[in-house]
Regions:
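Disulfide-stabilized, aromatic/cysteine-rich ligand-recognition loop
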Residues: 3-66, 74-79, 86-147, 153-182, ...
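Intrinsically disordered, low-complexity peptide-like regions
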Residues: 1-4, 361
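Functional-site microenvironments in short loops/helix caps that host divalent-cation chemistry
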Residues: 163, 167, 177-226, 246, ...
Length: 450
């Protein structure tokens, strides 16, 4: 049997979990650092798809709102080609047909807007061969492109960093889709072994948080890669508030389920109730009812419910739980705003990844396993899991900061989400890498997505 520490070491040895800095004293060293991280990220993403057991797993839709996994396997490679050509860094496409098929996903859909289009998907082997060609092309560009430090967002190198961070995003979203496939379609992969400890959840409590001025927004000369929505300036004076010491655990959420929370429209707003009735949800998405008790679905296994792990729900479920919990406690409970989350993060004194040295202070970046872990495993100041474990929904729909500018190479990354339909998630998760784990990161999804 392989020792768990060996597994963790193998994961960390294979992958740089923190984002690349844009500055440095030696351009050639930076070139080789980028080459290494590109290949690590590209290979890690491919290894995630080793979970797929058979040819049917590649083309079966995990959920109706998303493409099958064969699309996402090709999509991240096609992204490099499309963006590099758009920026004028390559003249000839590698495979125009595949680059058309894999160009755009279906992530911006309402929960009842089902994609019924029939696609003639290529074979996994054909996509693997295509990915090999893309890997060679990007590696060649890394060798040939002139490099001046620091890298700025109008540098050709920004496109390569964009491709790396884009693949990090899809590593996470593809892993979620795999959790929604039938178990018969997937098998375990050692590099993605889950956390193996569970127990009774601690009693949650509200802790006082002092008010104060919170400032958000990156400067253009920031030394970490950022998506366009991170730049600009925002500040807000917060009044004192209280916040939960721990993330909501499966055990804490169970009371809502057992009290009929999924059957009582009183706890749901109009959007949430529409989703509840359409989806016919009766419990969190990865909970599996069993005659011997609840079980939890992971990527390639089910396990007895780890009650002290955080519950994984969408924003509509989280808001409904808060309304229900308010009546149980007499407190006015709700999701935090983006400003409040950032204020908590600031007060925790948690540094971004540059200050971590060899110790990762959270369940993030596959550093502790490929699953959530107990909600009391990683103290961060007075609170736990302000970073890592699972993403934290906020009540804030994403919006542009004053000074926001669209990045011309990826003009549809953020702007389509400025529709009041996409709420921000903060903090990253156990599988978040690179930019996703930074406190300035601003990722937003429709409120019914997991």
């Amino acid at each position: 049997m392989t020792n768990r520490n060996d597994l963790k070491g193998a994961i960390m040895a294979r992958t740089r979990i923190t984002p690349l800095r844009l500055d440095g004293e030696n351009a050639e060293q930076k070139r080789e650092e980028i080459r290494r991280v590109f290949h690590e990220t590209f290979s890690l993403y491919e290894s995630l798809f080793d979970h797929l057991q058979d040819s049917a797993a590649w083309v079966e839709k995990a959920i109706p709102l998303r493409h099958p996994l064969i699309f996402y396997f090709g999509h991240t490679a096609t992204f490099y080609v499309n963006k590099l050509q758009f920026a004028g860094l390559i003249e000839v496409r590698l495979d125009p047909h595949l680059e058309s098929v894999f160009a755009v996903g279906v992530d911006e859909m309402s929960w009842d807007d089902l994609d019924e289009t029939h696609y003639d998907w290529p074979t996994p082997e054909a996509v693997r061969l295509y990915r090999q060609e893309v890997r060679k092309m990007v590696d060649r560009l890394i060798s040939e492109l002139p490099l001046t430090l620091p890298i700025t967002w109008d540098s050709p190198w920004w496109i390569i960093l964009m491709g790396i961070e884009h693949e990090n995003i899809h590593l996470e979203t593809s892993s979620v889709l795999m959790r929604q496939l039938p178990l018969s379609r997937v098998s375990p992969v050692v590099a993605f072994a889950p956390w193996d400890q569970a127990g009774t959840a601690p009693q949650n409590a509200l802790l006082p948080v002092p008010g104060g001025l919170v400032k958000l927004g990156k400067a253009k000369d920031d030394r970490q890669y950022g998506w366009d929505n991170e730049y600009g300036n925002h500040q807000h004076e917060l009044q004192p508030f209280t916040a939960a010491k721990f993330l909501v655990s499966n055990q804490e959420f169970l009371a809502f389920v057992e009290d009929g929370g999924y059957h009582n429209p009183d706890w749901w707003d109009e959007e949430g109730d529409g989703w509840r009735r359409f989806s016919r949800a009766e419990h969190p998405p990865f909970w599996v009812p069993d005659v011997e008790g609840w079980r939890l679905r992971l990527i390639a296994a089910e396990r007895p419910m780890p009650w002290n792990w955080p519950v994984e729900v969408n924003a509509l479920e989280a808001a409904a739980f808060c309304r229900w919990k308010s009546t149980q406690t007499g407190e006015n409970l709700r999701l935090p705003s983006e400003d409040e989350w950032r204020h908590l993060r600031n007060l925790s004194a948690l540094s971004d990844s540059d200050g971590w040295e060899d110790k990762v202070p959270a369940n993030i970046g596959l550093s502790a396993g490929c699953s959530p872990c107990p909600v009391d495993a990683f103290p961060q100041g007075d609170f736990y899991d302000l970073m890592g474990n699972v993403w934290e929904w906020t009540s804030t729909p994403i919006y542009p900061f004053p000074g926001f500018e669209v990045h011309p190479v990826y003009d549809d990354f953020t702007v389509p989400t400025f529709d009041q339909q996409h709420n921000l998630m903060k903090g990253g998760s156990f599988i978040s890498l690179g930019n996703e784990m930074q406190q300035e990161a601003r990722y937003a999804f429709r409120r019914h997505f997991f």
